[in-house]
């Protein structure tokens, strides 16, 4: 019923007739890119923006994302405008869709893999609408062209780039991009100075641990993060930072209370791009699969990524040097928020020794990065 309300209220019947006559790629001038997912997902889609900007240098590129993920795109030279889809009453959602329709988009690239975004794309009235439909759902009927990935298990960066092939464009391997501003860099440097992490003689080695995640099954046990922090601090005489967003601050503080090395809790302290500027200055990032891991990899920081229910071949770090810890059990890649087996085996089987060994190898060949 909800979709039928949108269809009747925005004149989609006319769009359906017009889209059926669309045969080929236009010289696009006003493109809407849709990614209604999480921070890491939006970050991994940035190579598509680069590809579109290269192919259509004079086009206006607008990206639609969920509220809370827009910081990923701040200062990005490949996008002209970022719009946020707000959660709220249905009439407000309808007005938002009508606003999109008035924008006069001639192309939509939907990177979401979702029914809602497909309906939004159709509602814009754009004659060219590219999207994915790997599940062979009804939404495939709403696109003018369905993008087809080269292989089922390819990395999400490469998967998203297949949308450009659907536009008839050549695709090249892409790397995600973030753009901290000079102000972001200065904010981090001022904090480091105040925290005693900058010294004229020798700045300490910085290691950032990320003990939180979006759902519980992706979380390596807190006590193991605490043990890892102490062992790294003892072995490398480094300063440990505990990251996360504001919602994960309590998790970081719980880990800190279990340690001897007095780590600095930075969870919730910085904006997304300030966090990027901070992790860029760290010698190592160790954390669960999630947005922070992708930010660290994008900034070129060496990463040890701990994977459980998600598949590193699709979602692994892309950017700097990385080591993935993953057990690959028979229930692997369940993508479930809680363990269907009831024992969290995929994370419980990852020992502190294993992560410490991987982290040590990274630190032994990585110089300190406290200077920008």
Segments (PLM) and residue ranges:
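Catalytic machinery of carbohydrate-active enzymes
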Residues: 2-372
